[in-house]
Amino acid sequence: MDCDNISLQGLDQTNPCDNNQSGVKTAFLCPVKDILAINATHVSSPTSLDDFVTIGASTLDRLAITCKPGKGFVKIYSADDMGELKYTQQGTILGCRSWKGALELFHPGFKRTAIGLMAYINNQEVIVVAKLNNGLYHLLGDMDRGAKLASGNEMTSGKAATDKNGINPVLEYNCGRQQIFWDGFDPTDATNGIPILSAVSADTGNDDTGNDDPEEVTGT
């Protein structure tokens, strides 16, 4: 990659007319083994700081991510003020530093579908598309190194009647730089979005065909 043409940009006060909301409420997840290709990539010769972390700098003429036939992403709902995406610098030697991305979600409801999802991805790598409340979509994972559940993830039934209950996954991904989809990216777009599986009730774990395979974990 050629970085010689990047022009630095100053960081002025945040525009009060922009969407500056914090948090994450929605994420999409798919096991790496179910993905054929990630077509949205960094530009080879970025010219701005935005370019440096943007993937698919302009809208693609194909899906941003291609899955195997019959496979796709599931949507995960996170409760208000309970979802967060954080990047932490790691490494001490200049030239060897990188980032650890950590996406934390809380899906309310200690139900079979949610518990089953955690059990299913416990020992495998996944690709995650996180929708931030500010409108940006971040990609965690690549074909060589997917995101993984961090150690110590919790699922809880709660104790008191007023306690929260549900799953609290934290998905981690080590990366050299962030992967943020282009402005205007829409995961549901049939041309350049991502394959998303049909909705399934989180209460019953059943879809409208009577199958008991978890495909989506949504709020109720």
Q: What do these predicted regions represent?
A:
Residues 1-29, 192, 197-206, 210, ...:
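N-terminal alpha-helical "arm" segments
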Residues 76-146:
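Structured, beta-strand-rich domain cores
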Residues 11, 32-35, 108-112, 133-135, ...:
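Generic structural motif
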Residues 2-6, 14-100, 146-161:
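Solvent-exposed edge beta-strands and adjacent loop segments
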Residues 145-219:
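Mixed-charge, glycine-accented linear interaction segment located at domain edges/termini
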